[in-house]
Swiss-Prot record:
It comes from the Archaea. Optimum temperature is 90 degrees Celsius. Optimum pH is 8.0. InterPro entries: FAD-bd_oxidored_4_C (IPR004113), FAD-bd_PCMH (IPR016166), FAD-bd_PCMH-like_sf (IPR036318), FAD-bd_PCMH_sub2 (IPR016169), FAD-linked_Oxase-like_C (IPR016164), FAD-linked_OxidoTrans_Type4 (IPR051914), Oxid_FAD_bind_N (IPR006094), Vanillyl_alc_oxidase_C-sub2 (IPR016171). The gene is dld. It is a multi-pass membrane protein. This is D-lactate dehydrogenase.
Length: 443
């Protein structure tokens, strides 16, 4: 009897398909998926426990699968084994009195948003695509455009139910914001990308519903001018979003969205979103005092949606042309220097680099476009680029995670950290069955 036959006695087993073979990682850098794997779709932690206990005894790799929206190859099954999909783990309950939602790992961002709204609450950060799942967002510590004001996924996870590699079910945290009760295993699991345990359920913090927005679009002559404005605005207030786009990114967003941006002038453009009109007014004055070409305020939903659409469609316009999506994060005051020096580096390698991102928190999205013979020089360029980010006080990924794509840079740039991570992995998963080859190399 094969191990697949044995597994089918525990849970229904499905054959491999492309729906579980890939995620959103650009194909040129995506890890190669295994041809042979099976898919299981457990409904609860008890079923997950039985699957993992079996897999651990047989030393069979298990690859976790949420919404498949990741950009670092974290959900790609790179070896023959089991793809564990959380799509049936959709339990969702809102405890409005305590302002929390208890979610199965397969609950999507849209389902969480809608449930919170029905109870007069909100989930503010919006850290991923609407089809991203709670489990996946926790596993990557997803961020998004509102991180400056509302933080990342880590700031909303109050408790977790998870299953260890040997099948043990653990519960960490509670329904409370405060927790000073020993080592924070909760925060060790957040951002672990499925390599330490399988997240099955989470208690998510909710907030009051957000107020009406005011959106500012502000072109600047230079990136330095724009970033001076970012630093000054963020020093005095916290916008819901504080985005930047270089001119080429704006042009791409316009083309794909079919919308017209407010100005064709300027090297850099800022997009600010406020919940307070008074703050928006003060930010506009700051921008004008720091050399803005003009300040455009959108107060109607139609005008706001038009501006947000230009920003939101940039990647769609680049998707088929990029080698990959880089998301280094640097201190906000260093964005202009990082942008200038990364462009100089790209020019040395003959690479066209399109840049935009979350200016308020320093998360820079860069898209190197495909060029002839890219395989010979691109990875050397990427290492130099990420080394530059680290030299400026930054990190190699702000929100997309390491997955299978940035392993070598993590190991080379943070060797002491990498070794500690290997030891932690060995403690949680000594047989290395959980998402092997992701975040840390095979043990």
């Amino acid at each position: 009897m094969s191990w697949i036959d044995e597994l089918s006695k525990i849970v229904e087993v499905f054959p491999p398909s492309d729906a579980y073979r890939f995620d959103e990682t650009p194909p040129l850098v995506a890890p190669r998926a295994a041809e042979n794997f099976v898919v299981v779709k457990p409904s609860n932690s008890e079923e997950v426990s039985a699957i993992l206990k079996f897999a651990n005894e047989k030393s069979i790799p298990v690859f976790m699968r949420g919404g498949g929206t990741g950009l670092s190859g974290g959900a790609v099954p790179t070896e023959e084994g089991i793809v564990l999909s959380t799509e049936k783990m959709t339990e969702l309950e809102v405890d409005a009195d305590n302002r929390v939602a208890i979610c199965g790992a397969g609950v999507t961002l849209k389902q969480l948003d809608d449930a919170a709204f029905r109870h007069g609450l909100s989930f503010p950060p919006h850290p991923g695509a609407e089809t991203a799942t709670v489990g996946g967002m926790i596993a990557t510590n997803a961020g998004g455009v509102r991180a400056l004001k509302y933080g990342t996924m880590r700031n909303y996870v109050l408790s977790l139910e998870a299953v260890l590699a040997d099948g043990r079910i653990i519960n960490v945290g509670g329904k409370t914001i405060k927790n000073s009760s020993g080592y924070s295993l909760l925060h060790l699991l957040v951002g672990s990308e499925g390599t330490l345990a399988v997240i099955t359920k989470a208690t998510i913090r909710l907030f009051p519903q957000m107020r009406d927005m005011t959106v500012l679009a502000i072109p600047f002559p230079t990136m330095e001018d724009a970033m001076n404005c970012v630093v000054e605005v963020a020093r005095k207030m916290l916008p819901m979003a504080l985005e930047f786009m270089e001119k080429r990114a704006v042009e791409i967003g316009e083309k794909v969205s079919g919308e017209r941006w407010v100005s064709r002038e300027g090297e850099a453009h800022l997009l600010m979103v406020f919940e307070s009109f008074d703050e928006a007014e003060e930010a506009a004055k700051i921008a004008q005092s720091l050399g803005a070409i003009d300040v455009y305020a959108a107060t109607t939903k139609k005008d706001q949606d038009r501006l947000l659409k230009v920003r939101g469609m940039i990647y769609e316009g680049l998707r088929k042309e990029v080698i990959e999506v880089l998301d280094a994060c640097v201190p906000p005051a260093k964005i202009a220097e990082y942008w200038r020096r990364s462009n100089e580096l790209a020019e040395e390698y003959g690479i066209e680099l399109i840049t935009y991102g979350h200016a308020g928190d320093g998360n820079v999205h860069q898209h190197p476009l495909v060029y002839e013979g890219w395989e010979k020089s691109y990875f050397e360029f990427r290492k130099s680029l990420l080394s530059l980010a680290v030299s400026l006080g930054g990190v190699i990924s702000g929100e997309h995670g390491i997955g299978a794509v940035k392993l070598s840079e993590l190991e080379e740039l943070f060797p002491e950290q990498f070794e500690l991570m290997r030891q932690i992995k060995l403690l949680f998963d000594p047989k290395n069955i959980l998402n092997p080859g992701k975040v840390v190399r095979k043990l």
